[in-house]
Amino acid sequence: MSSSSNSDPSSSPDNTDFIPLKDNPKDTSSYINKKNPFVNDSFDSHDDSYLDNVNPFEYNVADDEDTISMTSDGVEFHNLGITETVDEQDKILSELQLAYPTVSRYSETLDKGLLNGDKTTKGDYTSLRRFRKPFLFDKLSPYFTHFFSEIYAAVLRVVGPPRANETPGRNLPFSPILRQIYNHPLYNIFIFVVIVLHAVLLMIRSDDPHDKSQTIDYLIIVIGILYTLEMLLKIYLFGFLYDGSSSFYDFINSYTKKTPRTMSYLRHSWNRVDFVAIVALWISVIGKKQQGIFRLFSMIACLRLTRLLNITRKTETILKSLKESSTPLVQVVSFNAFFGVMIAILGVQFFKASLNRQCVWLGDYGDQYLPTGQFCGGHWENGIKRAYLDKNGFPSNVNPRGFICAEKSVCRVVENPYSNTVSFDNFFNSLELIFVIMSSNGFTDIMYDIMDAEYFVSCLLFIISAYFLTLWLMSLVIAVVTSSFIDLQHSGKNQKEQKSVDKHLIRNKLCEKYLFYSNFIWISFIVAQFVTLCTQTYDQTSSTANRYLIFYACVDFLLAAEVILRFFAYLPDYRLFFRRYTNLVDIVLAVLNLVTLLPSIRKNPVAFGWLSIFAIARIYRCILLIPYTRKIAKLLFSNFKQLLNLMLFLVIVLFIASLCAVRLFQDLPNDGDSDDDAISFATTYESFLYMYQILTSENWTDVMFAIQARLAHLHLSWIPGAFFTLWFLFSNNVVLSMFIAVIQVNFAPSESDLKMEQLKMYLARLLRNYNPFQASLTLNALIKRNGSRKGKTVDESHYEWLYEDNIIKGFLRVTNIPPKEPLKPSLDTSPELSKYSLAKLSNNFKRFVMRDDPFSQAYFKRVIGIRWEKDMNLKTAAKDMQAAKAFVRIKQTEFLKNHPKYNDVFWVIKPSNRIRRFCQRLVMPGVNERYGGVEPYQWVYRVIQVFIYACILTAVIIECIATPIYERDHLLNDKQHAWFVWTEVAFATIFTIEAAIKIIADGFCITPNAYLRSTWNCIDFFVLVTLWINLYAVLTSHALLSRAFRAFKALRVLRLINLTQTSQRMFHDALISGFFKIFSAAVVSATLLIPFALWAKNVFGGLLYSCNDDNVLSASQCVLEYASTPNNWEVWAPRVWSNPPDYDFDRFPHALLALFEIASIEGWVDIMRSVMDITGFNNQPQTNASSGNAMFFVLFNLVSMIYILTLFIAIIISNYAERTGSAFFTAEQRAWLELRRKIKSMRPSKRPAIRPLGLRGLCYDFAVQKHGIWRRTFTGLYIVHLLFLLTIFYPCPIAYTYVRNSIFLILSICYTINICVKVYGLSFYYFFHSFWNMFDVVVTLGSLTCNIAILAKFENRSLTLLQTTLLVLVTVHLIPKFDNFDQLSKTVVASLPSIFSLIATWIVLYITFAIAFNQIFGLTKLGLNGGPNKNFRSIRNALVLLFTMTFGEGWNDVMHDYTISYPNCVNGDDFYNSDCGNKPWAYGLFIAWNIISMYIFVNMFITVVFDNFSYIHTKSSSFTNLQRNDFRQFKDSWAPFDPMVTGYIPKRNAVKFVLSLRGVYDFRIYRDEHTLRSIISKVQSKTGQQSVPMLENPLMGSEINLEALDQIIDTIDVNVVKERRNVLNSLCTEIMTLPGNVISFSNILMLVVLHKIVDHREAFPISDYIRRAYVLSELEKSIRMEKLLGLVETSIIRKTFLQHMEEKKKALENPFILLSEVSEILPETPIQEVLRQHNADPEQLLMSTRTPSVSDRSFSIVESTVPTIASGEGDDNHSVEDHLKVPTDNEPRRSPSLKEVLLRGSHSLHSNNDRTSFDIEAGFGTAESDFQFGGATEDINRIADRIDDYLDRDSFKG
């Protein structure tokens, strides 16, 4: 060992691998070769695997000999005296294998792992060892070691998260000593304690800011000093920005290159956070205390506490997932912000000065000035509408609009709301309100205020912004976080070891039976106790309460005894009893329920109510008893630990955010508004509640606006706006999205089963196509019914391909398939049930009551389902489905023979009846194929269908016009001639005739094609009945009957869904296919709601009563009258002791309704504030008297968000993904679908193929260069343009407005010059081929015209709005300038078809519910939450109000307004004379709309966006490295072959085009160095070089170096060349088999990608894979056939040539023929003919290539219009039906025999026009032919293989 080894390690310049224990203590990942999957190689990557097993205890020399274990790489490890064979069930023992390199206590052998880091001395080695074997705790129990090791691991995670590839720091004086202090465990623990103490002190100071503030401030200063010393220590040891371990040049390059990072202080992300916090702390201490801007620095100082988020491994993992998703998250947020900025600019121009106008009450004599808060646009003055008054009291010069103030009041300009902080007067205020819209909570009040101040149409900006920004773009944020977290979950899930499931079997069968059957008895006791608790009320008598108590005690003792009996049933294996979690839970519940029976608790209503949760919790046994709820519940709780960790992460984040909010907003001055004064951040607890309220988004704008108003006088209102906005964005959109990801993972199949699930789903779709009971109901499908039925013929060859072993094995990538592989997918993850199960009993009951009806769809499903469950496998599926179909037909025939009247309508009208046959000629059967009837006349049927749909549409329009108010006004004037009544009679008659025709044609309910067998017919029939009932009620003036049935007429609108197939499919996916799953989720949600509702009733029942006079203290004082002052007007009113009007917990139904409203994240804040004021029974509430009660609603709200809202979202996402098939796609398949989408959307570049010359060439360069100076200049101009748009504000000086418009005019001229340059460079033809160019022309010329007109004093409001709109549209040009924006925009556009179909379906439901609400509540009195536009009195108002309720905006308050009843309303005898509400209809309609729209369709919107974004987000693919430059290179290669940019090139040029491709698309057989020209240039002999063998070539005129030629040929890889040649042959063959004589751009790009880049075995879904496999197989056969024909042609030519030579020889030997006459006599040889053609016209040879005509049958992947058997519902988005197909022939054909092929081979050189159909079929005919590939094809393949071998051998001979 060298002498230098004894020196200090810090002095060695090569000690770059030393990792100090502070920031990376003993990182052993490099020794054991375990790479952390979460490590990111980016700037701040970490590796914290060592933290899983940390032992901070010192080694005791007096300890006994320890055991040494060796790893695979020879590193020694202590195992702490624990044996290596650990029980799999004991996780703690397995985690105690602490992996830290040490040496044996008696061994002098050094650790090789540390020696690799140049630690060459024993002293250096031992000085670095800090983690050694404990002595005392390990002797007591290994659990102590694990416990304290976990604590220290948490300390290290908080204090100093490790970093990878760090250097040891700088070598300065005292560095070794300071480094030892820095690395000592006590130092880490001390810093951890300081951080925790800092948090505690901040919390204490917040709770009591006045008494203890000075002392705590001093302690915080001390903590700041400690933080500073820690920071200085790190800077001294490792440097601030640069540690000196490398050159400064390397340091600079480390920011841009992948080089090992230094350990300098600011190179670590957490250190940067610490640095900012410490600097802010000292600024806040030095600055003026808690005043002004220094509040912000006090808040920033709290960021040091964010290190507590690393306290557990899981929370640290959550942080890492956020860090991994930070880049796409920033991109998505920036993309959303861009559109938010655009709409904010429009908001400024549209609505500036709109919120500063209010109605001001002047009084009877005009001597008062009282702003009413009602926004307005004018006022009434002597019966005339007047415009509003400005701030000086002068009339404005605009027309009155919006809400018109009543007489004795004026509409006048006042201050904007919330101290002038809420408005659209400038960009920043407008942007804040736009973000409020994006938050989907709190924006509807602003929308209605704007509608009152402006026009009704103003709501369109809010509606469009809400759908586009909130549902569309903000869903991308959810998709980013969810996708990243799901990827992390899957990676962690793959690392987990599979646990063996222990089946806890009871040996005694008698005991097993006892446990099963007695379980129903005990559960009946639980249900009885639960129902009894529901019926108990707070105001019961003492005797009743005693009876209840006796019953509870009996049940509690019985259930406690049941637990004991259950324990004895497990004997003698009593350990099995404790292994079941349910037994442990029942023990705890039994003990706690017995404790609640103690007298001290029983006599305390509050304690008894809170502890009743333990009796309620027993209901979980009922949930687990029901199979469906048990499945969902187990799926939900299967990842329960991850949910708990997320909750812990959320609580820590909430705590830190609460402390930050207190530092910012504590003790703010009041602005005099009493409502704002109620919002206070005085304590940490209150701050916690408000921050949690913002997290849930419930009225979060009230908090933000109130705090902004208090800081307005300091001009710091931007601080709460930014703080609360960022907190909302992070907590609501990011953190809550993680819960969606956790739950969604539980519903996702495992990675290993994805392809098998695809195969099962594919076969299920085949089954649906075989189903004879499938019927299409869309108008489009009905009109084309005849043609579509012909297309349903199933191609048997399709099934042959599907069920061949090699195809299935190739897709599944397996070598063996189980012969009985079950096909039906199952979501049941629960263990197998015993034979004594409730499911078995229910199945027996179903079989007993079920009747067989072979004409029902359920019967077919049941028949095939029996085969599906038992016998069907991958190889016999097609035959089984055919057998099932035939079996059903046989059963139908037998059934009709046994029941001859079954097909008779009403048992009278037989199928042969003329009237019935006439009706059958008019309509199609609703379901099934018509049995024993006739088909309708197509043209008659089409006319009738169009007429019926026209009647439906007309009826809907009339319903929208004839509202109840319109009917009432019309009937008052002319009751006898109510046109809407008679039109309703006419439509009812038409629909009745339609129903009668359908019933006569196919029967009513029990015939094979009965009318009521169709779901839509059932709806129509129900609507028809209710329509006649309503007409009867109207004509007979029966008010109650009319109101009860008026709403049902709206159901007729649902028929409009059938206008398009996409909307019908979307309706089916949203409401029908997923109904059962959604219903199951609703049931599971109810199991959460019901226990919490019962608990809330027990706790808060009877405690919410209050007196309307705040001055009384109890119910006894709430009598007589008092002086009430509503709106500062004194009125005498009686005192009333009552509950809040909209909620209470006195009865169980009331509590259930209140919690259901809370579960929708609406109204829970008001309820929480009410229970916080409880003072006791019959006592007046006081503010925050029982503030702890708020935690009940915080807990329920959090649980409901996680287990109700996120459960619905996860289930809807899962159901939609399963319906479309995307749930089973692998990463490669998702990447392929995204690539396919890109290819389909690509078009050739719109530019000339040849660059022009001169000035036009320069303009051409400006137009086409993507990164040139011209493009960058205009990108800068667009940015400047956007910045000037941000400067629009109110009030704006006229001079600045003129300057700004002048600048916009100059910019518009620049844009016009840009257009002229592009037009001149590209020409008009190419310029106007681009959409962006046409858009540019329209927007630029429009903005130029508007700017000129405005500067020319032609200004008016409409022109200004148009100008602003066009100027905003100009900024859209920035999207294609940035790659991230361009990619995200394409993602948004990709989801357009699904979004439009969803919106179309949604609009139909909007109209349906709008008509229903209008018909029921069109005359109802307005409540407190109503307004001039916020009501159901017209359809347009109803639609807008339904829109607000879709986002949950106060839907529950509006619902309670419409439950108003007498005596608070007029309840007249006639419907038109009553303004009361209707409770049943209100609860039914509002809750139905809430579930359908807010829960289902909103989440469907998110699901569609998420489904499209998941393709973009996929990164794990072998071909995702295709960049935009690769596609641009392809376009550049295409341009010379398509100079007119038609998108097509002739097939004769296709091969030349393919060979011209370079880069990733290179198809050349030989590379550049192996081309003929390159080889010739290398082997040509130079003058004078004759030392090697030469060969003189007379054609080339030079000599060839044979040795050099041999060396070059030896470098050619024969296998690679052969593979390239095969790929090229396959591509060219497939191109030539396409129909037509041209090929499109997208088609050839698709073929190039498929042959060159994509591996279809990995990337294709099942339907695409099968088609592609078929195509490749046929291509291979075609190529082999060509080779065989070529061999035959060669033989024929050779034979002809020999005959020619023989004749020539004979002619030469003939003495009578001269030699010069031989060539004239003999005919031209075939070889000479080919050579002559080649020499005369080189292109002729390419043109003579066989190109099938348009009529030829193609099997290629492109331009397919033939419907495939796999096409079905949900398959349009995720299969390549339009790109891949299997041949399907309408009529059978016979393929030629091998003999015929060989005989016709001699004529293959003839022109393509001479080819017959047999020629084409020789290569491609397969369907229903006599040509069996099993025999003849083997001969062909054998011959072709021999030709292949011959050619390969001869090609490289010599």
From Swiss-Prot:
Known function: Voltage-gated, high-affinity calcium channel that functions together with yam8 to mediate calcium entry into cells. Required during conditions of environmental stress.
Bilayer topology annotation: Multi-pass membrane protein
Entry GO MF terms: stretch-activated, monoatomic cation-selective, calcium channel activity; voltage-gated calcium channel activity
Matches recorded under InterPro entries: Ion_trans_dom, VDCC_alpha-1_subunit, VDCCAlpha1, Volt_channel_dom_sf
Comp. bias (Low complexity): 1-15
Keyword terms: Calcium, Calcium channel, Calcium transport, Cell membrane, Glycoprotein, Ion channel, Ion transport, Membrane, Transmembrane, Transmembrane helix, Transport, Voltage-gated channel
Similarity comment text for this entry: Belongs to the calcium channel alpha-1 subunit (TC 1.A.1.11) family.
GO cellular component, one term: voltage-gated calcium channel complex
Basic and acidic residues: compositionally biased ranges: 1771-1790
Main location: membrane
Gene responsible for this protein: cch1
Region (Disordered): 1-33, 1764-1792
One GO BP: calcium ion import across plasma membrane
Subunit structure: Interacts with yam8 to form a Ca(2+) influx channel.
Source domain of life: Eukaryota
Residues linked to a glycan: 40, 310, 699, 786, 1058, 1184, 1356, 1508, 1773
Location of this chain's protein in the cell: Cell membrane
Name of protein: Calcium-channel protein cch1
Ranges annotated as spanning the membrane: 184-204, 220-240, 274-294, 328-348, 427-447, 461-481, 514-534, 549-569, 581-601, 606-626, 642-662, 723-743, 946-966, 980-1000, 1021-1041, 1075-1095, 1148-1168, 1193-1213, 1274-1294, 1302-1322, 1331-1351, 1358-1378, 1393-1413, 1486-1506
